[in-house]
């Protein structure tokens, strides 16, 4: 069973979501938010690093995925998001994980069916798709959606690979 960690990086909250592929669909394992504390930038980045490291140690995912940085109207916000993303990627890479990257548009398209979906729609779909009792917090829902998007992508690649292999076998 493939277990994936999704990360939604942020300078105040970093969402995480862990899902695995089981029974032909994504299955919920865990989700939550790392509350980013600290007065200085270095302290906040260290908080993200340690939090992601702890999540990886706790849930032992096979693969990881993170949202790509989008160019916000505020360059300072985009820079801070990029820094948060960087330490999250480092924390996962140091524990041997390959980290896939997906745009917010691709993630929303994968789980909601439209790339310009609202946050509440992502929350609703994660609740429905993963059979959750309640809507997950917005950052955790985004992280779950990133993990589900990665699972969908991996499953599609595996199907394409098996079709290609079977075609090659018939051509011989």
From Swiss-Prot:
Chain sites annotated for binding Mg(2+) 2: 67
GO CC annotations, alphabetized: cytoplasm; Holliday junction resolvase complex
Example GO biological process: DNA repair
GO molecular function, one term: DNA binding
Positions of the catalytic residues: 8, 67, 139
Top class in the EC scheme: hydrolase
Transmembrane domains' residue ranges: none
UniProt keyword annotation of Metal-binding present: yes
EC number(s) given by UniProt: 3.1.21.10
Keywords linked to the UniProt accession: Cytoplasm, DNA damage, DNA recombination, DNA repair, DNA-binding, Endonuclease, Hydrolase, Magnesium, Metal-binding, Nuclease
Annotated catalysed reactions: Endonucleolytic cleavage at a junction such as a reciprocal single-stranded crossover between two homologous DNA duplexes (Holliday junction)
Entry annotated with the keyword Nucleotide-binding: no
Details of cofactor binding: Binds 2 Mg(2+) ion per subunit.
Ligand binding (Mg(2+) 1): 8, 139
Co-factor(s): Mg(2+)
Annotated PROSITE patterns: RUVC (PS01321)
Coiled coil regions in record: none
Cellular localization per UniProt: Cytoplasm
Family under the similarity heading: Belongs to the RuvC family.
Function comment: The RuvA-RuvB-RuvC complex processes Holliday junction (HJ) DNA during genetic recombination and DNA repair. Endonuclease that resolves HJ intermediates. Cleaves cruciform DNA by making single-stranded nicks across the HJ at symmetrical positions within the homologous arms, yielding a 5'-phosphate and a 3'-hydroxyl group; requires a central core of homology in the junction. The consensus cleavage sequence is 5'-(A/T)TT(C/G)-3'. Cleavage occurs on the 3'-side of the TT dinucleotide at the point of strand exchange.
PANTHER family: CROSSOVER JUNCTION ENDODEOXYRIBONUCLEASE RUVC (PTHR30194:SF3)
Subunit structure: Homodimer which binds Holliday junction (HJ) DNA. The HJ becomes 2-fold symmetrical on binding to RuvC with unstacked arms; it has a different conformation from HJ DNA in complex with RuvA. In the full resolvosome a probable DNA-RuvA(4)-RuvB(12)-RuvC(2) complex forms which resolves the HJ.
Protein name: Crossover junction endodeoxyribonuclease RuvC
Organism encoding this protein: Hahella chejuensis (strain KCTC 2396)
High-level lineage: Bacteria, Pseudomonadati, Pseudomonadota, Gammaproteobacteria, Oceanospirillales
